[in-house]
Amino acid sequence: MDLSSSPNHPITVVSTFASPFEGPPSVGDSNSSARKPISLWPGMYHSPVTNALWEARCKIFERLLDPPKDAPPQSELLTKTPSQSRTTILYNFSTDYILREQYRDPWNEVRIGKLLEDLDALAGTISVKHCSDDDSTTRPLLLVTASVDKIVLKKPISVDIDLKIVGAVIWVGRSSIEIQLEVSQSTKEGSNAADDVALSANFIFVARDSKTAKAAPVNRLSPETEQEKLLFDEAEARSSMRKRKRGDQERREFENGEANRLQTLLAEGRIFCDMPALADRDSILLRDTRQENSLICQPQQRNIHGRIFGGFLLHRAFELAFSTAYAFAGLVPYFLEIDHVDFXRPVDVGDFLRLKSCVLYTELHNPDQPLINIEVVAHVTRPELRSSEVSNTFYFTFTVRPEAKATKNGYRIRNVVPATEEEARRILERMDAEACI
C-alpha cells in the first residue's frame, strides 16, 4: 500500500503469533513475501498494531530505516487535508482468539498499557504520512513525541468485542503537529458514534531535520469540513494555552495564601514524624506509598530513529502507577485518566531508566468513587557520568473497582499527607493544575 491509498480502507490488526491450530502458509500463499517478516526488522517495538502499520506503510518506513545519504531536505511544503492522514485500525477481538489473548488483562478487559503503546505508534505513523513529501530523493524528517494531552477513559473496554481506533492530523504549527485518536467500541446495537467512544487522546509531535536536529517546517493543513475546522480551532487554542502555562509556571511563586496551604498540609505530617502513636490512622505519609522500578533500555524497544519510543515509556509508567495504586488501596484499582505528559528529554538505547512512583494525594469527597492520584517520575541515570535527569513526569488517576470494593464492608481509602515542604509543594502544584483544567 502506498501513500495514495484510501483512508477509507481500515488496517486490520492480527495476532503476532501463529495460531497453534493453523499450519504453515503454503508456498503459493499470496500473503507470503520474499521480504523479511516485519517482526524481524531491527529497531522497532513490535505489537499487532505496529506490525500492521509497518506492513501497510512499508515503502515509507523502509526509506526512513535507510535514508538516502547526503540527500537534500524537503524543498517545498505541501498542503494536505486531514482525510489524507486519517488512518483506521481494527482489532477483531471477537474472531481472533490469539489477538484477544495478547490484549486481555486479568479482569477480561483490554490492557490499557498495551493500548497506550499502540496509540503512540499510530500517532507516529499518521505524523509520518502527513509530513511525507512523496519524494524519495529528499531526506525524511525526524518526528518525535513532544507531549500527550489528557487521556480520559470514558467506559470500560472489553477484550471480547471488536475495537476500532481512528486517527488524523487535526492541527499543524510551524514544526509541530497534533494528532487526535479515538478508540471506539460498540456494545449496543443502534448506539450512536459518540456513545461508542471509549477513549480519546491527542498527541503532539515535533519535526526535526534528521541531519542538523534543528526544528524543521512541516506540511500545511487545510481543514475541509466544519468539524475539521472546529477541531483545528480547538487545537490552536490548546497550543496558545500551553504557551501561556509555560510562561505562568516560570513566574509562579508561592504567596501568603500558598504558605498557609503549605502549613495546613504539613501539620498532620509533622504529627506522623514527631508523635507517630498519635497520628491519624486514616492517613499515611506520602513517602510510605512509594514504589520503584528500574530497567536498562534495550535495542528492541527503540523506534526508527534509534530512541526509546514514547509509547514504551507510557506503558511502563502505567504499569508502575497501577501497582502503586493496588498496593496502596488494597483493592484492584480502576484506571480513569492520564494528565498532560511532556516528553522533556529523549531516552536512548542503553540508558538506565528509573521509574519512581507515589500516591500524591487522594480525593475522598465521593465515597462511591474515591480518587487516587499517582505521580510517576522517569529518571535517565548515567552511572559512568554520575548524572541523573528527569525525562518525564506522569500523573495517573485511579479509583477502585466497584466489584472489588463490594467485597469489603466499611472499606476506606486513606488520606495522604506530606512530611516535607517539597512534597507539600508538589501536591499543591498538582491540585492547582487539576483545578485549571
From Swiss-Prot:
GO terms for molecular function: fatty acyl-CoA hydrolase activity. InterPro entries: HOTDOG_ACOT, HotDog_dom_sf. The keyword Chloroplast applies. Keywords: Chloroplast, Hydrolase, Plastid, Repeat, Transit peptide. Residues 1-13 form a transit peptide. GO terms for biological process: acyl-CoA metabolic process. It is found in: Plastid, Chloroplast. GO terms for cellular component: chloroplast. Mostly expressed at low levels in glandular trichomes (lupulin glands), and, to a lower extent, in stems, leaves, flowers and cones. SUPFAM superfamilies: Thioesterase/thiol ester dehydrase-isomerase. Its EC number is 3.1.2.-. Residues 89-211, 287-404 form the HotDog ACOT-type domain. Acyl-CoA thioesterases are a group of enzymes that catalyze the hydrolysis of acyl-CoAs to the free fatty acid and coenzyme A (CoASH), providing the potential to regulate intracellular levels of acyl-CoAs, free fatty acids and CoASH. Belongs to the acyl coenzyme A hydrolase family. This is Acyl-coenzyme A thioesterase 2, chloroplastic. It comes from Humulus lupulus.
